């Protein structure tokens, strides 16, 4: 027999003996509820035994419903089974069992074995005793069940919390692993891109170098082909012949000018000599001839390369004066032309006329010329002099001014000329200089006279 209470289902069963309809001994009370509390118990007397009815009454004012449960009092014990399938706020099912071997029903059972009937007073006393012991047992069961429920809920909460923390830890580890793999991928990608860029740059540089080499070889090949074609066509040979002819013509012009200049000077000197001999009458060019030589350490230096008489020297001087006057008034000679200036200075050196009035003015004007080529040509011409004796004071003064020139090439040429000329007069220990004047008479009867010599140390 079962009775349903809101949130609780209570069932009580009684097992009877088949022969005498007497209840057998039950093992105990099984209760599945948190609020299964008997409020009232009634005992009802039956024909063949004693059957007890327990009524559970709940105050309806508090929102509860009263239910009844019928049971049987047996001599060997009692058996109560309460089934709770959950309350309004919980769906959990709890089962509890209670077995009391020293219950008051045992006395009742033993008494039922000895006598067949109970008095009403005894039944009431037993009922009160059962009620009090059952309430205490139910209270203990409820406290135990509540503690057990709280413990289980706490364990479940801790388990859920632990699982949540574990999941968070796994998720964090996965995120860290994903980030690490991402960084590794980025690093590998960066290395790969760097290698690719480096490789591409090297390839481009090699390609440009190859192109430059090809272009250079092609240009050389084209130039060689053009030169070969030009040579095969005869143009290069014609150019060489033309250049050679230009050089030869310029050389011939220079030689012709020099020869013409020398011829004019020779004609002037011859005319002067003829005039001089015509005035003297008895004198002849072969009367007296002499030449001066310089000996240094046994080596002879000819100051005048040919035999020159006193009359010839005078004639040369007069011819030079006439020539210098003619050159200063002529328009055909340009002093600013380096080639003509060198030729003119060389002629003056050969005539030993560097100390003349016209020569001094010429050297002074050319040495202070603003044209660099003119000053350089004058320095080169003066450097060709055989000795300082030939240059004289005017020539050496011009060289000294040119040695201090602002132009490096001019100053270097003048300094080198001065050093070369100075070395001729440097006397070392054991050196000796001797000037010799030789006179030769043309007469066949006279013998040669030796001239006096001066030794200088």
Swiss-Prot record:
Keywords: Chloroplast, Plastid, Transit peptide
Localization terms from the record: Plastid, Chloroplast
GO cellular component, one term: chloroplast
Chief location category: plastid
Domain of life: Eukaryota
Family: Belongs to the ATA15/OSA15 family.
Protein's name according to its UniProt entry: Senescence-associated protein OSA15, chloroplastic
Originating organism: Oryza sativa subsp. japonica
């Amino acid at each position: 027999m079962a009775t349903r209470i809101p949130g609780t289902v209570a069932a009580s069963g009684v097992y009877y003996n088949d022969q005498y309809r007497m209840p057998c001994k039950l093992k105990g009370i099984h209760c599945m509820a948190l609020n299964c509390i008997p409020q009232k118990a009634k005992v009802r007397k039956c024909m063949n035994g004693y059957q007890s009815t327990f009524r559970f009454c709940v105050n309806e004012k508090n929102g509860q419903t009263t239910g009844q449960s019928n049971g049987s009092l047996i001599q060997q014990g009692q058996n109560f089974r309460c089934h709770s399938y959950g309350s309004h706020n919980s769906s959990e099912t709890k089962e509890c069992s209670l077995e009391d071997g020293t219950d008051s029903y045992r006395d009742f059972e033993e008494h039922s074995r000895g006598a067949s009937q109970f008095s009403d007073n005894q039944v009431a006393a037993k009922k009160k005793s059962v009620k009090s012991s059952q309430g205490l047992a139910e209270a203990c069961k409820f406290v135990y069940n509540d503690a057990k429920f709280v413990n289980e809920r706490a364990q479940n909460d801790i388990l859920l919390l632990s699982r949540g923390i574990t999941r968070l830890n796994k998720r964090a580890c996965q995120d860290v692993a994903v980030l690490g793999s991402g960084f590794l991928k980025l690093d590998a990608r960066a290395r790969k891109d760097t290698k690719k860029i480096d490789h591409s740059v090297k390839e481009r540089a090699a390609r440009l170098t190859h192109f430059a080499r090809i272009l250079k070889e092609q240009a050389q090949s084209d130039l060689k082909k053009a030169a070969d074609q030009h040579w095969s066509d005869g143009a290069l040979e014609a150019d060489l012949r033309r250049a050679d002819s230009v050089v030869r013509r310029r050389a011939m012009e220079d030689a012709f000018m020099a020869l013409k200049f020398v011829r004019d000077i020779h004609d002037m000197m011859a005319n002067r000599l003829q005039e001089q001999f015509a005035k003297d009458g008895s004198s002849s060019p072969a009367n007296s001839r002499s030449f001066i030589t310089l000996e240094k350490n046994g080596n002879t230096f000819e100051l005048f390369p040919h035999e020159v008489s006193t009359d010839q020297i005078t004639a040369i001087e007069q011819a030079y004066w006439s020539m210098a006057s003619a050159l200063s008034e002529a328009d055909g000679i340009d002093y600013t032309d380096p080639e003509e200036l060198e030729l003119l200075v060389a002629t003056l050196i050969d005539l030993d006329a560097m100390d003349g009035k016209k020569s001094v003015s010429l050297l002074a004007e050319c040495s202070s010329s603003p044209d660099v080529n003119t000053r350089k040509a004058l320095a080169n011409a003066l450097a060709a002099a055989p000795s300082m004796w030939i240059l004289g004071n005017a020539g050496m003064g011009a060289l000294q001014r040119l040695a201090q020139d602002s132009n490096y090439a001019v100053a270097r040429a003048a300094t080198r000329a001065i050093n070369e000329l100075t070395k001729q007069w440097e006397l070392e220990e054991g050196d000796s200089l001797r000037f010799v004047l030789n006179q030769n008479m043309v007469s066949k009867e006279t013998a040669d006279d030796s001239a006096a010599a001066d030794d200088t140390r």
